[in-house]
Design a protein with these regions (language model features):
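Membrane-proximal helix-turn-helix segments that form the acceptor-binding/catalytic region
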Residues: 100-109, 131, 135, 143-166
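Donor nucleotide-sugar binding/catalytic pocket of nucleotide-sugar-dependent glycosyltransferases
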Residues: 36, 138-141, 153-202
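Nucleotide-activated donor-binding/catalytic signature segment of Leloir-type glycosyltransferases, i.e.
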Residues: 260-281
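N-terminal subdomain of nucleotide-sugar transferases
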Residues: 1-55, 109, 134, 288
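Short donor-sugar binding/catalytic loops of nucleotide-sugar-dependent glycosyltransferases
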Residues: 9-10, 219-224, 253, 278
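Short alpha-helical donor nucleotide-sugar binding micro-motif in glycosyltransferases
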Residues: 277-278, 285-290
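Conserved donor-binding/catalytic core segment of Leloir-type glycosyltransferases
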Residues: 167, 204-226, 232-237, 248, ...
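Short His-centered aromatic/hydrophobic patch
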Residues: 116-122
Length: 297
């Protein structure tokens, strides 16, 4: 079975939940193709980049024409089927052609499943799976179903009608999706975020009575929605009250410089360390040596 996983950007090294999914599917014998942009943090031989345009208007126009001609020669029936599906959804012809270009790299492949790893990546790709006679599924994660629809009302209306199956990381997110129109007749699977409890269990229960310095730990992507800046603000209050503590933050992401600035502004340079990305085997010792694990919610 051939599965296409659709990303906006390929998973970073800290997005272990996605990397583990890819690895697990391949271990079970599935043929996995990745569609996205950016750099892949781990080697994967089957990656396909989203179409990109460069140069002035004339150059971009030529690029679009060449891509569409190649697609029409390679997959004429799927291409016309896609346009027909778009038009039946009320999409203007010019926008249907734009979407055909946007999805040309997916339509040109033969897939059994098209899975959108983040819900919002399905926008303008609602008809891709049906056009290539594949089944469509998606994952419900926090931002894409809790915040994105608030900014883009009705964005998933067409999506729900074309889904074969839904994966959610919680019952709450699934309930939120139903408020936005997901019907109960679409099969859904709840797979909660988890860890290997056998690997991360302590070999022996150490004395966890607090020492002179309280040791905090967070393992997280450095992203605004993880609330790390609020965590730093809370810890600064502890420092003002005279508590001694250290705080290790493991992970990488786009907010590193902003968080470093916040650390400096809050006078936490001696207390807070940004460890960066670590492999799982190197994270275990941090858990064992910490007193309290912090997770913003």
């Amino acid at each position: 079975m051939k599965i296409g996983l659709i990303f906006t950007s390929f998973p970073s090294s800290s997005e272990t939940f996605l990397l583990s999914k890819i690895h697990s599917l391949e271990q079970r014998g599935f043929n996995v193709l990745l569609f996205g942009n950016g750099k892949m943090s781990r080697y994967h031989e089957k990656i396909i980049y989203h179409p990109k345009l460069g140069g002035n208007f004339i150059i971009r126009l030529i690029q679009v024409i060449l891509v569409l001609l190649k697609l029409l020669i390679k997959q004429p029936f799927k291409s016309f089927k896609y346009i027909k599906l778009e038009r039946s959804d009320g999409v203007l012809l010019i926008d249907s052609i734009k979407n055909l270009f946007l999805n040309s790299h997916i339509i040109s492949t033969n897939l059994d499943w098209v899975h959108f790893c983040f819900c919002s990546t399905v926008i303008r790709r609602e008809n891709v799976a049906k056009a290539i006679d594949a089944k469509m599924s998606l994952s419900l994660r926090g931002y894409d179903i809790s915040i994105y629809p608030l900014k883009n009302r009705g964005c998933y209306t067409k999506v729900w009608k074309k889904l074969y199956k839904v994966h959610s990381i919680s019952n709450d997110l699934l309930s939120t999706a139903k408020k936005y129109g997901l019907t109960s007749d679409i099969p859904a699977e709840i797979i909660h975020p988890a860890i290997n409890v056998n690997y991360f269990s302590s070999e022996k229960y150490a004395d966890k009575s607090f020492k002179n310095t309280l040791r905090f730990l967070t393992v997280s992507r450095l992203h605004w929605k993880k609330g790390l800046e609020y965590t730093l603000e809370a810890l600064s209050m502890l420092k003002i009250d005279g508590y001694n503590f250290s705080y290790d933050i493991i992970g990488d992401g786009p907010e590193l410089e902003r968080l470093k600035f916040a650390r400096n502004q809050l006078n936490l340079n001696k207390n807070v360390k940004f460890i960066g990305y670590l492999k799982q085997k190197n994270i275990k010792k941090f858990y064992q040596n910490s007193d309290i694990y912090l997770q913003y919610s």
